[in-house]
From Swiss-Prot:
Protein source organism: Ruegeria sp. (strain TM1040) (Silicibacter sp.)
HAMAP family: RimP
The family this protein is said to belong to: Belongs to the RimP family.
Residues of the signal peptide: none
Keyword terms of this UniProt record: Cytoplasm, Ribosome biogenesis
One GO term (biological process): translation
Protein task: Required for maturation of 30S ribosomal subunits.
GO (cellular component) term, any one: cytosol
Name of protein: Ribosome maturation factor RimP
Major localization class: cytoplasm
NCBIfam families from the UniProt entry: PRK00092.2-5 (NF000932)
SUPFAM superfamilies hit by this protein: YhbC-like, C-terminal domain, YhbC-like, N-terminal domain
Amino acid sequence: MTNDLIAKAAIDRRLAEIITPVIEDLGYELVRIRLMSGKTTTLQIMADRPDGGIEVDDCAAISNAVSATLDVEDPILDAYTLEVSSPGIDRPLTRLKDFDMFEGYEAKLETADLIDGRRRFKGELAGIEDDEVLINIEEHGETVTIGLKFDWLSDAKLVLTDDLIKEMLRQRKAAGVLNEDAFDDIETEGSAEGTTGSEEENK
């Protein structure tokens, strides 16, 4: 089931319904999707492997498969650019399991409504308990652990720290991946008619 952290707007949720099966059939998971309007409409997709470690070739495969599916479904009226990327080091946390996976690392959480007079919480993730995200925060000079229901969250992401960078590099080295270009985005041009891989804008 898609939550607001993965897809916020109605169009994002509609797109998530279309592309999630495509991404999962390839062995990946959807982390976040956003249709961004502006001078150029951009469909931003973040994806990952279940155990992490998505690479440029993976993003290209996802991009090609998603483009082919959007050719048929045609959910976007205007010309658009499709961007598929890894979540990055200071990644957004969009699934309950993310908070368990990154236990011990610093994160920023934001809730939709005020919780005890505040919406923003920053501290060390302490795992999950049922449907709650646990986080250690500083309060009156002491470290306390609080629980926030996952459904309360409107935004969540890791904080870029030396420890996090070292861990990500360690994982990449252990996986035999040393090419830092693997964090780059894969971009293809697309349109409501589904042209992909073109450098020209399509309408």
